[in-house]
């Protein structure tokens, strides 16, 4: 493969990660593999052991293992089955006897004795396996499990957004677990604090605090601000001055410093927080307290005299009498609590209760209608928040709680603690007092906590697996109740279908398990990197507001700000940014380079939104010298999500790349920074709709991301390790090691004409040659929409921005006939058709070529077995699979009786049920698959297909064995040459020196018979050869068995025949095209090349776009792309001309001039010889590829330099001539080279014409829609139009013979056949339908003409109105 190099205008400092690593790592955490540890064992351990409830037996988990899949990925797609592996677990049944195994301290039994132990390995179900590309194959269809962004477990604080009558916001707190009951706290308008469990009826928080075991004294200690007053020697009471407690207080007494005695502030003054802090800063620590102020305060602790007597209990409200007696009591200190602002204590005072009352009240709310006991209430309350079986915060929730409240609990503690609840209540009380801030749920991080996290496929599978095992455990308990433990085995208690059904339900019906978008490699990779806020446990798109959809500052480098759908889900479905990854807690991280002492280093670290808040981060474009030191004294940075200028010494991190804020699709748009955001969004989305073309072409103006996307998509074949290509053909590549010490063989199989989910063609082409050395990671074969290892979604066209005869009005596109003639935008689509052969009640259906009643012209593509031949050209209406179905016998006629009497057998009565090619489809049969039911002997075409598959496998095996044999014999030859022969083997005699020429005269298999000194090493080599030979043979024998194996088909199905037809779609008017900047349009006309506008040298343009489509859309990036593309295109023409002239010195100087600003390429060119430079220049004949990276593309002066170098006007405009008149246009026109895509909205899939077709059974009107081969509806408004013009006869035709007048239709047909113009109208069938509906209402309405006799109904006894 010739290497693909682009002209870069920036430097790539940080390589890209595996683009589907998110999916792979997440699923690996579930099933294990690589460095990941399987979580299946942990889930088993959390559910097992399962006890029968009576202490008779226990079923324990020992271990589990995953088996191997029955078929490979493609085999599952072919057969329409799930790519999965069996899960087997070793379970141990422990049966207990009546005896005890020991005694307690007083002779009480401790545990029953083990009577019997039985272990067994049990099949638990099939677990879907992720393919190497990060997808799942479910029922033969590739699916993707989209990652979901949801609220992270933990505590959230918010307000109700609506102010109360007093103008104050009421605050709420919510503790949300990953699994378990929600706990909400909220204030009402009267500042009373309530709590709810699972959004049930609210209760005063007193009940919760009492249930947690708190007394009033504990509540004072936990939630109240206690003021300790001390009695001085002169008989005055002093209190500690705390600025926060004096905030907003109007003094009721003179504020006097107790230490100095000076007056600080006079009575009546109001103290602000600023004033309070200033007083504290000036040394005010203690102040005198007036006894009158103590009135109405509460005792926080028992008032105890010096003798230890309790004078007043805690919680006592001080009255005038109490205050008056204080100076006479024998106390020197008192602890007081003020009711104002202490919402929790005020709630306790209003709604006080005992521990038992609290427990019973909570039980009644959780389980209304049940009669509670204190024991059951305690058990329920304990299980709600403190039981690991029913409550789980995950390590994320624990980390967030620890960070929010400065706790130090271990990550493994994933249940609530009392301290968590106390801290939440305390924080909420502070918020109600307007101290602190609420959380921003749209943050990916807020202060010291992250609020939104991502859960991927591994976590979903964890949850489903747990649900399945819990259900299975319930069934096990039920089975244990009736089991005979003397004989029962573990397998008899397990129903393996339960687990498989839960997992299958998730993959088949979950909103996050989606049919993979497989239009092109970019759509695949984008789908795998998608993050949805919808789905179970997520948002509802109908109720999601603007805030949650909007771009947030924390999305920087984590979620793409550009790529999102345009419809109702805008902002709810996003894509990961290029460099972003998800950490073990589910938070999205983005990489940054360390900056130390003003020097940007190459050391990279990943930061989440939590870690990033307090960091100073500069942009990737910051100016640095050669050693990485920042040049500017003040640097533009982000800190706490605000943009600030800071000294360079304070910079901590730098972005790794300017493009790290965009997604994969957006990073493929050159000059993205010059496009309006809405058009950039459209450009990102429309690239995913581009159809792979027959001859893909990489863009001349790319972004440098094309190669990374091609590799990451899995559409190309990449070398696993360095070696030499030993063999290639259209379907196989064999690479072997270059080293003879550690020999290996890698065999690669290419995909050929495989159908994708969206009917595009997956076809791989080999790009290496035999004998070529390849490195690890080199591309061996291109896939669909890939050229030379780079993504190639469209073609480079010469474009002119020009209004041309009205044909490009309103974004229409005019195309040259050259584009169609050269098949530049021709694509191949695969249509799959399936014929199912069933065993009916009257007998089995049969596949045959002998189909009665079908003309031979429709059977031309069938072989002798009745199945279409591969390579046959088929048209609409042709039979792809001939099939007949038995039908019930009709009464026997005398003629049939005579035939039976003569021939002695009954003629089988069958009907045609063949598979026909539907209307609007024509193409070539490229593949046929025949699947047969297990137990039925393979016949006909099935055997032929099986033989072809086995022959292909044998050929692949023979190639590998040939490579191995050549390698072994080359080693043997090296070992023999130069040695003395110890025996005779003609023409070598005993004692002769063995030479290479002599060995060539002997059959290679006979070389082993030669005896030399080092015979032991030769024997070891032969053993290695035999072992490796057997290993290869064994592998392929297993493949042969899989091919020969039967297929598991549905009940009653004998055979399934799948026929794949390749349909070629050429470009035609009505097809949709677009660029990469959101500039889309429909082809209005394909103009002959000679009529297209042409340049001064006679070159006609390929496509004409409307210049009015640029200013209003504000996607100026397409103009810059056009200019740069024009320079690249003409530089290629210039190089081609110099090569043809043989002027190699100018070629070299031109190449060096082009790449002079690309440091990496210049270093490479300096290492190349003149001959190598000329050879490289031959690959640039079609244009010099350039990379205009996002936010780091070439500036205007660089584009002008390249245009001048190419010999073009630096303005990018050219003189154009009209191809029709030959006249020059009035002014210069913008002409350039632009990358255009053909989208999958093809006119062939939308338009059709009906001549004859089916009718509706009831109304007898033609059906509607292309799938029913329907007609155009002449509706109500169209009738009005004909009425308005007075076209009565035309209207009558439309409503009768052209619609549902059955008799009239037949008459018209007869008239046409006879050549007459006379016909008459009948009654439309819809009129009869209306009449029958009236009769169904018991209204017998008859319509008569005026000429018919009218009956007299006057004598009938009818009720007359008004009598």
UniProtKB/Swiss-Prot annotation:
It catalyses: RNA(n) + a ribonucleoside 5'-triphosphate = RNA(n+1) + diphosphate. The keyword Hydrolase does not apply. GO terms for molecular function: DNA binding; DNA-directed RNA polymerase activity; ribonucleoside binding. GO terms for cellular component: DNA-directed RNA polymerase complex. The keyword Transferase applies. It is an enzyme of class 2 (transferase). Its EC number is 2.7.7.6. GO terms for biological process: DNA-templated transcription. Keywords: DNA-directed RNA polymerase, Nucleotidyltransferase, Transcription, Transferase. The RNAP catalytic core consists of 2 alpha, 1 beta, 1 beta' and 1 omega subunit. When a sigma factor is associated with the core the holoenzyme is formed, which can initiate transcription. Belongs to the RNA polymerase beta chain family. DNA-dependent RNA polymerase catalyzes the transcription of DNA into RNA using the four ribonucleoside triphosphates as substrates. NCBIfam families: PRK00405.1, rpoB. This is DNA-directed RNA polymerase subunit beta. The lineage of its organism: Bacteria, Pseudomonadati, Pseudomonadota, Alphaproteobacteria, Rickettsiales. The gene is rpoB.
């Amino acid at each position: 493969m010739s290497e693909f190099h682009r002209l870069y205008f920036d430097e790539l400092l940080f390589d890209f990660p595996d683009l589907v690593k998110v999916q792979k790592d997440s699923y690996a955490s579930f099933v294990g593999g690589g460095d990941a540890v399987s979580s299946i064992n942990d889930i088993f351990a959390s559910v097992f052991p399962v006890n029968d409830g009576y202490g008779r037996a226990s079923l324990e988990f020992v271990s589990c293992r995953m088996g191997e899949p029955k078929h490979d990925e493609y085999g599952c797609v072919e057969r329409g089955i799930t790519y999965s592996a069996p899960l087997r677990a070793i379970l141990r049944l422990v049966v207990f006897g009546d005896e005890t195994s020991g005694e307690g301290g007083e002779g009480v039994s401790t545990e029953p004795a083990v009577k019997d132990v039985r272990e067994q390995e049990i099949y638990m179900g099939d677990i879907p396996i992720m393919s190497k590309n990060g997808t799942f194959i479910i029922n033969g269809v590739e699916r993707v499990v989209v990652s979901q962004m949801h609220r992270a477990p933990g505590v959230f604080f918010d307000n109700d957004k609506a102010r109360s009558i007093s103008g104050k916001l009421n605050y709420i707190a919510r503790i949300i677990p990953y699994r378990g009951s929600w706990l909400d706290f909220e204030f009402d308008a009267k500042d009373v604090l309530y709590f709810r469990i699972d959004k049930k009826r609210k209760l005063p928080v007193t009940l919760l605090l009492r249930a947690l075991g708190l007394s009033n004294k504990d509540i004072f200690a936990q939630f109240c601000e206690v003021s300790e007053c001390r009695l001085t020697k002169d008989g005055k009471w002093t209190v500690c001055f705390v600025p926060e407690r004096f905030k907003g207080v109007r003094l009721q007494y003179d504020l006097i410093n107790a230490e100095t005695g000076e007056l600080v502030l006079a009575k009546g003054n109001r103290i602000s927080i600023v004033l309070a802090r200033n007083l504290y800063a000036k040394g005010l620590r203690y102040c005198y307290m007036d006894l009158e102020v103590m009135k109405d305060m509460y005792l926080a602790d028992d008032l105890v005299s010096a003798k230890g007597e309790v004078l007043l209990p805690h919680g006592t409200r001080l009255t005038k009498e109490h205050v008056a007696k204080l100076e006479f009591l024998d106390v020197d200190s008192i602890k007081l609590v003020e009711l104002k602002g202490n919402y929790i204590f005020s709630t306790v005072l209003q709604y006080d209760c005992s521990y038992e009352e609290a427990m019973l009240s909570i039980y009644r709310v959780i389980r209304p209608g049940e009669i509670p006991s204190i024991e059951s209430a305690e058990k329920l309350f304990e299980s709600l928040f403190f039981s690991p079986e029913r409550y789980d915060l995950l390590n994320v929730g624990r980390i967030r709680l620890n960070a929010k409240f400065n706790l130090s609990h271990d990550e493994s503690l994933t249940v609530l603690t009392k301290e968590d609840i106390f801290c939440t209540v305390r924080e909420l009380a502070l918020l109600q007092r307007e101290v602190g801030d609420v959380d921003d749920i749209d943050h990916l991080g807020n202060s010291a906590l992250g609020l939104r996290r991502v859960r991927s496929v591994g976590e979903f599978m964890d949850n489903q697996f747990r649900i399945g095992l819990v259900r299975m455990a319930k069934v096990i308990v039920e089975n244990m109740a009736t089991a005979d433990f003397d004989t029962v085995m573990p397998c008899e208690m397990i129903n393996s279908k339960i687990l498989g059904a839960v997992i299958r339900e998730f993959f088949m019906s979950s909103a996050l398990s989606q049919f993979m978008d497989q239009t092109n490699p970019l759509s695949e990779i984008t789908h795998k990197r998608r993050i949805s806020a919808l789905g179970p446990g997520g948002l509802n798109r109908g109720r999601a507001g603007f805030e949650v959809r909007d771009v947030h500052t924390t999305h920087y480098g984590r979620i793409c700000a550009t790529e999102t759908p345009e419809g109702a889900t805008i902002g709810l479905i996003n894509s990961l940014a290029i460099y972003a990854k998800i950490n073990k807690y589910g938070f999205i991280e983005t990489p940054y380079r360390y900056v130390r002492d003003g020097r940007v280093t190459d050391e990279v670290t990943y930061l989440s939104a939590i870690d990033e808040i307090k960091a100073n981060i500069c942009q990737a474009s910051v100016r640095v010298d050669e050693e990485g030191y920042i040049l500017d004294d003040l640097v533009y940075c982000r800190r706490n999500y605000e943009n600030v200028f800071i000294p360079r010494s304070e910079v901590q991190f730098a972005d790794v790349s300017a493009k790290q804020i965009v997604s994969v699709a957006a990073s493929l748009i050159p000059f993205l920074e010059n496009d309006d955001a809405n058009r950039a969004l459209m450009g990102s989305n429309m690239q995913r709709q581009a159809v792979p073309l027959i001859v893909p072409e990489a863009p001349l103006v790319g972004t440098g991301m094309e190669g990374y996307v091609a590799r990451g998509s899995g559409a190309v074949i990449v070398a696993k390790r360095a070696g030499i290509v030993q063999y290639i053909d259209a379907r196989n590549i064999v690479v072997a090691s270059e080293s003879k010490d550690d020999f290996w063989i890698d065999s690669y199989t290419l995909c050929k004409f495989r159908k994708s989910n969206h009917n595009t063609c997956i076809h791989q082409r080999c790009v290496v040659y035999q004998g070529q050395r390849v490195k690890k990671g080199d591309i061996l074969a291109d896939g669909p929409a890939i050229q030379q290892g780079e993504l190639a979604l469209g073609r480079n066209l010469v474009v002119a921005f020009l209004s041309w005869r009205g044909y490009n009005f309103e974004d229409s596109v005019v195309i040259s006939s050259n584009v169609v003639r050269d098949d530049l935008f021709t694509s191949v689509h695969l249509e799959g058709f399936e014929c199912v052969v069933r065993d009916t009640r009257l007998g089995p259906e049969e596949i045959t070529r002998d189909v009665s009643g079908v003309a031979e012209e429709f059977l031309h593509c069938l072989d002798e077995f009745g199945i279409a031949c591969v390579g046959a050209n088929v048209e609409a209406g042709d039979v792809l699979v001939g099939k007949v179905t038995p039908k019930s016998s009709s009464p026997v006629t005398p003629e049939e009786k005579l035939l039976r009497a003569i021939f002695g057998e009954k003629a089988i009565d069958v009907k045609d049920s063949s598979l026909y090619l539907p209307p609007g489809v024509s193409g070539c049969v490229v593949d046929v698959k025949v699947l047969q039911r297990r137990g039925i002997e393979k016949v006909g075409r099935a055997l032929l297909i099986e033989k072809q598959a086995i022959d292909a496998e044998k050929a692949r095996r023979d190639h590998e064995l040939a490579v191995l044999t050549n390698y072994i014999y080359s080693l043997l030859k090296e070992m023999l040459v130069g040695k003395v022969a110890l025996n005779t083997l003609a023409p070598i005699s005993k004692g002769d020196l063995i030479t290479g020429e002599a060995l060539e005269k002997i059959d290679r298999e006979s070389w082993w018979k030669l005896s030399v000194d080092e015979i032991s090493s030769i024997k070891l080599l032969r053993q290695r050869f035999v072992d490796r030979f057997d290993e290869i043979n064994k592998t392929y024998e297993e493949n042969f068995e899989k091919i020969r194996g039967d297929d598991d088909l549905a009940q009653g199905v004998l055979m399934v025949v799948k026929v794949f037809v390749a349909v070629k779609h050429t470009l035609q008017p009505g097809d949709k095209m677009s660029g990469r900047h959101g500039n889309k349009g429909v082809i209005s006309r394909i103009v002959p090349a000679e009529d297209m506008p042409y340049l001064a040298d006679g070159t006609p343009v390929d496509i004409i776009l409307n210049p009015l489509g640029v200013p209003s859309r504000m996607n100026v990036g397409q103009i810059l792309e056009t200019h740069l593309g024009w320079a690249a295109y003409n530089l290629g023409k210039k190089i081609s001309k110099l090569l043809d002239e043989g002027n190699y010195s100018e070629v070299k100087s031109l190449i060096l001039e082009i790449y002079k600003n690309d440091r990496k390429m210049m270093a490479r060119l300096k290492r190349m010889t003149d001959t190598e430079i000329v050879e490289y220049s031959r690959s640039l004949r079609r244009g010099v590829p350039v990379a205009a990276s996002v936010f780091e593309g070439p500036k205007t002066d660089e584009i002008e330099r390249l245009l001048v170098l190419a010999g073009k006007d630096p303005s990018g405009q050219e003189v154009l001539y009209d191809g029709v008149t030959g006249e020059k246009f009035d002014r210069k026109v913008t002409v350039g080279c632009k990358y255009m895509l053909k989208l999958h909205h093809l006119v062939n899939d939308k338009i059709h014409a009906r001549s004859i077709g089916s009718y509706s059974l009831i109304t007898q009107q033609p059906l509607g829609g292309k799938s029913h081969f329907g007609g155009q509806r002449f509706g109500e408004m169209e009738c009005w139009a004909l009425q308005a013009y007075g076209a009565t006869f035309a209207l009558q035709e439309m409503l009768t013979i052209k619609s549902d007048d059955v008799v009239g239709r037949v008459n018209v047909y007869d008239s046409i056949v006879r050549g007459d113009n006379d016909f008459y109208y009948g009654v439309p069938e819809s009129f009869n339908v209306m009449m029958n509906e009236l009769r169904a209402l018991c209204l017998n309405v008859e319509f008569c003409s005026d000429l018919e006799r009218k009956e007299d109904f006057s004598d009938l006894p009818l009720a007359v109105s008004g009598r």
